[in-house]
Amino acid sequence: IYNKFFGESERNVREALELAATMSRCVLWIDEIEKGIAVGDNDGGTSRRVLGTLLTWMAENKSQVFLVATANDIERLPPELIRKGRLDEIFFVDLPSPAVREVIFQIHLEKRGLSVDRFDLPALSEHSDGFTGAEIEQAVVAGLYSAGAADGVLDQALLEAELAATVPLSVTMAESLARLRQWCQGRAVHAGA
């Protein structure tokens, strides 16, 4: 989207939005939106103009394009973007619950051709408290590498060892997570399971 020439970034955004409109009914997914439109003073105003282009489209668009955006740091988003009328709702997705972690393990074990019957999913869920889905997936991948290096097969003990060796972001970034959870109180709909 971003281009080094003046005005090209805004044109790229307009073209992408026009393409979405021609494809409607559709969902337009903007992943980590704060990285593309966080407003700062170090880009010559490009981010501000890109934001303006998006806001204008959101206000004027009549096509059936459902806009969904994710953000890891919602506080970096400008208020004019997240106000009611621009976004219908703000959802907060917290860390996965124990039941959801079991499903995540099942998905990633089966994806790699492993029988989940060989694993105690509730125990794995307990050992992965505070883990994100990506961290659970990485523990499975790391366990497979460790098993392969030892000419063995991934088993419960090896996977639990990988989990024990992992420091999840909920620990590394505990203060940031606490601030995010606090910010979301009364401002966002909790979408957790």
Q: Residue spans of the language-model regions?
A:
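Walker A/P-loop NTP-binding motif of AAA+ ATPase domains
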Residues: 1-125, 131
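Generic recognition of well-ordered alpha-helical segments
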Residues: 53, 57, 104, 139-142, ...
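Short amphipathic alpha-helical interface segments enriched in basic and hydrophobic/aromatic residues
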Residues: 38, 144-148
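C-terminal engagement/docking regions of AAA+ P-loop ATPases
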Residues: 122-140, 149-193
